[in-house]
């Protein structure tokens, strides 16, 4: 676990992807409920 540094790339990726999915799903949910 000393030379294997995949978490250093994985942590920001997950940190960016998770909020993006959350915001996208929330946005789609609002768009589906409010048909303007």
UniProtKB/Swiss-Prot annotation:
- Cell inner membrane keyword on record: no
What is the species listed in this Swiss-Prot or TrEMBL entry? Jasminum nudiflorum (Winter jasmine)
The reply on keyword Secreted is: no
Where is it chiefly localized? plastid
Which segments cross the bilayer? Answer: 8-28
The Swiss-Prot or TrEMBL record describes its family as follows: Belongs to the PsaI family.
What are the entry keywords? Answer: Chloroplast, Membrane, Photosynthesis, Photosystem I, Plastid, Thylakoid, Transmembrane, Transmembrane helix
Q: What is the lineage of its organism?
A: Eukaryota, Viridiplantae, Streptophyta, Embryophyta, Tracheophyta
- The entry's protein name is Photosystem I reaction center subunit VIII
Query: How does this chain sit within the bilayer?
Result: Single-pass membrane protein
Q: Name one GO biological process term.
A: photosynthesis
Q: Which NCBIfam families match?
A: PS_I_psaI
Listed SUPFAM superfamilies: Subunit VIII of photosystem I reaction centre, PsaI (SSF81540)
- Disulfide-bonded cysteine pairs: these are none
Function, as annotated, reads: May help in the organization of the PsaL subunit.
Q: What does UniProt give as GO cellular component?
A: chloroplast thylakoid membrane; photosystem I
- What superkingdom heads the lineage? Eukaryota
């Amino acid at each position: 676990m000393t030379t294997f540094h995949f978490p250093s790339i994985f942590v920001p990726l997950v940190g960016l992807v998770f909020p993006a999915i959350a915001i996208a799903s929330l946005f789609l949910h609002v768009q589906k409920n409010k048909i303007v």
